[in-house]
């Protein structure tokens, strides 16, 4: 029996198993000891934390059944070592977890991209014949009080840290096909946002928007910077885009140089996430200018997208009226829609030393086990409140 972190035997499920053994009157068969359970047929239940015992686990033999409890916390590194270790004929790994984050390795590995011979089963309160009245009452209250928390606790759905998220998950849900719900159409500029992959396992991403409607998202890993720039340019031409906006710092510098060499069939602009705030003297809210509210253009751009999602949520749910160009709609036809929704809701709000809003760094997100939000960043660029400039000015 494994879990990612087990500081003591009391953190394990040994007591739960002992209670079941007693309830089923199996004490004569199982010897429940302090740190293990031994059966008369030679079976043995052992308990360990993966993170602190991963080296010794690699050398374990004779294990034919593994139960990983609280699997949502298990890291990619732990899975990559544990799975090849369980190699007895007919062996199996059973994982039980309540998913926190659609981007977590456990959820991606076994639910989104399950391997062959993997069976994934969603088990909720409806499947529990002993679900108590007290929990039913708590569930109904939570559904009214905090719908996002209810979805996670009682429906087993991965959700964001709603209180800290820049863009709340519930706002994003209401934005799906909002143009159909509210009766507006895709009109205005066609833009392609291009987030360039950093080193390692990072991905490239394109966002395709037409006015206030997000029509498609593409993500890929293969190819170098030049290949990715060419792919983006070809996709933009096919989309009949008016503008490509790309991440122009770091690896993106190579993209800038390559775009300058391409035929000027459409406008191209760079986006410097750490750059100065646009329209610094303009008031964001009464009494507070943009330069007093945001630490950089990245924060300002995420907030601009946040405002679109919030207004769309208010318009769809409560009937509030806003101009179409202040709203946003995510087409339900986007293949990567669920992943995009997760990425949009993961970055947390942060603040600089002067109290201005900034976006949680990718380094801090990585500490939480959250990969770089490439698709979300590509979309943010499409709605960034930047002043138009030519590629030659970058």
Curated annotation (Swiss-Prot):
Upper taxonomic lineage? Bacteria, Pseudomonadati, Pseudomonadota, Gammaproteobacteria, Pasteurellales
Q: What's one Pfam family here?
A: Terminase_3
Q: Indicate what this protein is called per its UniProt record.
A: Uncharacterized protein HI_1410
Under Gene3D superfamilies, the record lists: 3.30.420.240, P-loop containing nucleotide triphosphate hydrolases (3.40.50.300)
InterPro entries documented for this protein: P-loop_NTPase, Phage_terminase_lsu, Terminase_L_C, Terminase_L_N, Viral_DNA_packaging_terminase
Q: Which organism is it from?
A: Haemophilus influenzae (strain ATCC 51907 / DSM 11121 / KW20 / Rd)
NCBIfam families given in the database record: phage_term_2
């Amino acid at each position: 029996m494994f879990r990612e972190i087990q500081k003591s035997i009391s953190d394990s499920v040994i007591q739960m198993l002992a209670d079941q053994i007693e309830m089923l009157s199996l004490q004569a068969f199982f010897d429940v000891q302090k740190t293990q359970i031994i059966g008369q047929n030679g079976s043995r239940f052992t308990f360990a934390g993966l993170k602190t015992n991963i080296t010794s686990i690699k050398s374990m033999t004779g294990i034919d059944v593994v139960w990983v409890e609280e699997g949502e916390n298990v890291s990619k590194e732990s899975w990559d070592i544990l799975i090849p270790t369980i190699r007895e004929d007919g062996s199996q790994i059973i994982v039980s977890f309540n998913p926190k984050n659609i981007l977590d390795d456990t959820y991606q590995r076994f639910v989104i991209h399950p391997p062959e011979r993997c069976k994934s089963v969603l088990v909720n309160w409806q499947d529990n014949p002993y679900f108590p009245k007290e929990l039913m009452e708590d569930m109904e209250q939570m559904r009214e009080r905090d719908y996002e928390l209810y979805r996670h606790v009682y429906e087993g759905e991965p959700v964001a840290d709603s209180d800290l998220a820049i863009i709340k998950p519930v706002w994003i849900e209401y934005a799906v096909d909002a143009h159909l719900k509210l009766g507006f159409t895709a009109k205005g500029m066609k833009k392609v946002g291009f987030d360039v992959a950093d080193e390692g396992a990072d991905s490239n991403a394109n966002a395709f928007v037409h006015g206030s409607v997000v029509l498609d998202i593409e993500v890929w890993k293969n190819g170098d910077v030049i290949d990715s720039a060419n792919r983006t340019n070809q996709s933009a031409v096919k989309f009949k885009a008016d503008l490509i906006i790309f991440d122009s710092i770091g690896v993106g510098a190579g993209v800038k140089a390559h775009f300058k060499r391409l035929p000027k069939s459409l406008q191209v602009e760079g986006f410097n996430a750490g750059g100065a705030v646009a329209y610094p003297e303009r008031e964001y809210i009464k009494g507070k200018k943009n330069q007093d509210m945001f630490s950089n253009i990245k924060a300002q751009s995420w907030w601009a997208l946040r405002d679109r999602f919030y207004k769309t949520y208010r318009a769809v749910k409560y009937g509030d009226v806003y101009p179409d160009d202040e709203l946003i709609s995510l087409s339900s036809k986007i293949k990567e829609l669920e992943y995009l929704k997760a990425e949009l809701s993961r970055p947390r709000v942060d603040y600089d030393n002067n109290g201005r809003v900034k976006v949680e760094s990718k380094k801090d997100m990585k500490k939480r086990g959250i990969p770089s939000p490439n698709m979300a960043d590509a979309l943010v660029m499409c709605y960034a409140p930047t002043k138009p400039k030519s590629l030659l000015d970058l």
